[in-house]
Amino acid sequence: MKKYEILYIMRPNIGDEEIKKNVETINKIFYNNENKIIQSKELGLKDLAYCIDKHYKGYYVSMFLNAMPQMIEEFNRVVKINEDIIRSIVIKEE
């Protein structure tokens, strides 16, 4: 089990229900087996440093967790499928 920090950005033009649904979908990936979410924080709507998919703002969500590497692969798969998430990054902490 390794420690990870995950940050993902959602499109700014989706509603609160869609934001909540997307956060729950991502959290469900890690709510099984031995994985543990240490902190999940919705940072809200922020300006982007540059335009991504014609958006200048994005809804940021940050997570700190202990997870198996297979769950990170599953996270990346779900993010690629979900059109509401415009960018994500996974950082493995040492």
UniProtKB/Swiss-Prot annotation:
rRNA-binding keyword on record: yes
GO biological process terms on file: translation
Record GO terms (molecular function): small ribosomal subunit rRNA binding; structural constituent of ribosome
InterPro entries given in the database record: Ribosomal_bS6, Ribosomal_bS6_sf, Ribosomal_S6_plastid/chlpt, Transl_elong_EF1B/ribsomal_bS6
Annotated GO CC locations: cytoplasm; ribonucleoprotein complex; ribosome
Entry keyword Heme: no
Keyword terms of this UniProt record: Ribonucleoprotein, Ribosomal protein, RNA-binding, rRNA-binding
UniProt cross-references to HAMAP family, sorted A to Z: Ribosomal_bS6
PANTHER family in the cross-refs: MITOCHONDRIAL 28S RIBOSOMAL PROTEIN S6, SMALL RIBOSOMAL SUBUNIT PROTEIN BS6M
Function: Binds together with bS18 to 16S ribosomal RNA.
The family this protein is said to belong to: Belongs to the bacterial ribosomal protein bS6 family.
Protein's name in the database: Small ribosomal subunit protein bS6
Protein's organism: Phytoplasma mali (strain AT)
Gene name for this UniProt entry: rpsF
